[in-house]
Amino acid sequence: MAAFARRKAERLARPDPSRKRALDARAAELARLLNGRETFCTASSCDGRVLVLDTDGAGVQKKNCRWLLVTHGTCVKDDVMTALEKATGDVVFKFEPFVFHVLCRELQDAQLLHSVAVDSGFRNSGITVGRGGKITMAVRSTHCLEVPLSHKGRLMVSEEYIDFLVHIANQKMEENIRRIERFHKGLELALEAAIPADTLAPKGPEKSHSVYVHRRKRRSTREQADPSRELEPQDDPESSLDLFAEP
């Protein structure tokens, strides 16, 4: 416990390494909520964004690119067209969804976050246990979008198609925001329940099961009592804990 507290203090004292030098607004709210608890420490994050990147075609976008446009909300076609006027290489239009990494003191703490994340629609969320027992919970999803627009500065698609892409990206952003809001509300409720970490894991042979699985069992009981209830998107019964060790 002392080691986690020391690691948390060191991490929170570091300057923000991102281009923005600050957390995005929605991630900042979640960070304040979690960092106020001794069992959590937030790491890297992004609210989700729409990007227009000018790359050199080498395939390593993060190292060989210029950001022609970036927004953490919805965008309009005219902004994309204006950004394309500055293009000289291979331009890519992207939507990247919310991602949020949290260091957790105990595995049970990570399981609690995982349960809330999956319930909120972030079904690709997972837990990793690294060297030295460092536990990281990653909130993430797969509703990305990446489309090439130009090659060597030459536009390869129509303006009408760009308008269509912007519409799709905005739909994804709106759904992304709804999921973040569900995650935030669910997290507040879970933390307010104030269940001690050592009571989250069941006893006996079932100990290795995730909290999420046991919540599913209780929910199934309610659903049997009300067979007319339809499953919502976040009620996917196939969702499960993604727990694996880093090499």
Regions found by a protein language model. Name each.
Residues L33, H101, L113-V116:
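Alpha-helical recognition domains of nuclear gene-regulatory proteins
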Residues L112, V116-K207:
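Helix-rich interaction surfaces within compact, conserved domain-sized segments
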Residues R105-D109:
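Helix N-cap motif at beta-to-alpha junctions
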Residues F93-P97:
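Short glycine-enriched loop/turn motifs at secondary-structure junctions
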Residues F98-C104:
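Short cationic amphipathic helices and targeting signals
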